[in-house]
Amino acid sequence: MENLEIVFEPLPGEALTRLVTDNVIGVNFAKTGISTWHSVGYFLRSARGEWLGGLTGYVWGGWLHVNFLWVSEPLRGHGHGSRLMDAAEAFAVERDAFAATLETHSFGAHDFYVKRGYTVFGRLADYPPGHTKLFMRKVLGSITG
């Protein structure tokens, strides 16, 4: 077997990220027959062009997965996070998603997500130490067959 080198890339860039993503999608398609994968990215931009918040994730297999949601501290509590979530959830439903999932932490936005209809289905203690990682989900619509 060929001698392969493991290379650390702290900022892998789009090409390497795409290499891994495309190959995982290919394996998932081979196992499930589901080939559609939609990246999700909604962002808050000021009139001056400043980026002040955003949401990233993807839709696959009937689910929206929210990777990250962030709103600049001074803008929190003014509905911007809800607007970003609304946009992502609508995007997902338009692509036949019936549910959404995300992770947050006990020190994070748990209450925000509960108000939006998300429920905790799993917990990982001491992630990081002294805190809990929360796995949450929400039904967006009906499963259609």
Question: Model regions: which residues?
Answer:
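Conserved catalytic-core motifs of GNAT/GCN5-like acyltransferases
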Residues: 101-103, 119-135
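Acidic/histidine-enriched, beta-strand-rich ligand/metal-binding domains
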Residues: 75-76, 99, 112
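Conserved acetyl-CoA pyrophosphate-binding loop and the N-cap/start of the following alpha-helix
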Residues: 75, 79-87
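Acetyl-CoA-dependent GNAT
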Residues: 4-67, 72, 107, 126, ...
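Conserved GNAT acetyl-CoA-binding A-motif
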Residues: 92-105
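Generic C-terminal helix-cap and adjacent flexible tail
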Residues: 139-145
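Conserved active-site tyrosine of GNAT-family acetyltransferases
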Residues: 20, 113, 118
